[in-house]
Regions:
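Active-site beta-strand/loop signature of hydrolases that rely on acidic residues for catalysis
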Residues: 7, 23-41, 101, 130-151, ...
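Active-site-proximal beta-strand elements of phosphoester/diester hydrolases
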Residues: 1-9, 98-110, 142
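Conserved beta strand-loop-helix elements of the APE1-like EEP
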Residues: 60-75, 193, 204-225
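N-terminal, active-site-proximal structural segment of metallo-dependent hydrolase catalytic domains
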Residues: 1-47, 51, 57, 62, ...
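Structured beta-strand-rich core segments of catalytic domains in phosphoester-bond hydrolases
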Residues: 37, 42-109
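Surface-exposed cleft-lining segments at the edges of enzyme active sites
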Residues: 81-82, 107-123, 158-162
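Active-site beta-strand termini and strand-to-loop segments that position acidic
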Residues: 70, 94-97, 220-221, 239, ...
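Metal-dependent phosphoesterases centered on the DNase I-like endonuclease/exonuclease/phosphatase
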Residues: 30, 51, 122-210, 214
Length: 250
């Protein structure tokens, strides 16, 4: 089973940069996107052979998640069941017979870390949600998790210690999630590879490859041995992120 996850930084904008061609070329069984920045029906994209599921933020033009699936899930859940966290279209869960697929766009702590305190409460609530699912069947988490976990996951570690996405607090929450029974699939398959999934539009970061690895596939430990590939598609353009891939034998 091949899965793709991609923060498209606005689906309507990405569609003008060959998203449809990239979607077809990647040929995923489940294709998840984050930061759709739209309400249902606002994008002219209906790939043949797929069923679409979307979850939009209440605030128009902001956040949002979506999935396209070759095989329809048993059930679809929006949000994590916590009122304070379920207004921004951030978590879309698909239940299949043998696993849950959780598509997530984690809140950014923002410039000046204005939203770091909220981010910490989100992290705890989201981890609890994943553990509730994991108690029933294995979990595959994908998405833009807005954290570079370790120094190998970011080009300029020293100068970003207080930047949103690389604070000690955010990194510790990722460590806590993995310690709760989950595996970062790219790092498991490529323990020493330096590869990034996001580049700021500022400071000529793409030209310098001054990137961050903040897009993930994370799986329950008990299915980690089923992973056969975990890749980052740096050759695919259209957003400030690139797609990430998981192939798993489930």
């Amino acid at each position: 089973m091949k899965l793709i996850s991609w923060n498209v930084n606005g689906l309507r904008a990405c569609l003008t940069h060959d998203f449809a061609a990239s979607f077809a070329a990647l040929d995923a069984d489940i294709f998840s996107v984050q930061e759709t920045k739209m309400q249902p029906g606002q994008a002219d994209f209906a790939p043949e052979g797929y069923t679409e599921y979307t979850y939009s933020a209440e605030k128009k033009g902001y956040s949002g998640t979506a999935c396209w699936c070759k095989t329809a899930p048993l059930a679809v859940t929006t949000g994590i069941g916590r009122e304070e966290h379920d207004h921004e279209g951030r978590v879309l869960t698909l239940e299949y017979p043998g696993f849950y697929l959780v598509n997530c766009y984690t809140p950014n702590s923002q410039d000046g870390l204005k939203r770091l305190d909220y981010r910490m409460t989100w992290e705890d609530a989201f981890r609890a949600y994943l553990l509730e699912l994991d108690a029933k069947k294995p979990v595959i988490l994908c998405g833009d998790l807005n954290v570079a976990h370790t120094e190998i996951d970011i080009k300029n570690a020293k100068t970003n210690r207080m930047s949103a996405g690389f604070t000690d607090q955010e990194r510790a929450k990722m460590t806590e999630l993995l310690a709760a029974g989950f595996t970062d699939t790219f790092r498991a398959v490529h323990p020493d590879e330096v590869k990034y999934s996001w580049w700021s539009y500022r400071f000529h970061a793409p030209e310098k490859n001054a990137g961050w690895r903040i897009d993930y596939f994370i799986v329950s430990n008990r299915i980690a041995d089923k992973v056969t590939a975990a890749e980052i598609h740096n050759e695919v353009f259209g957003s400030d992120h690139c797609p990430v891939e998981l192939v798993i034998d489930l």
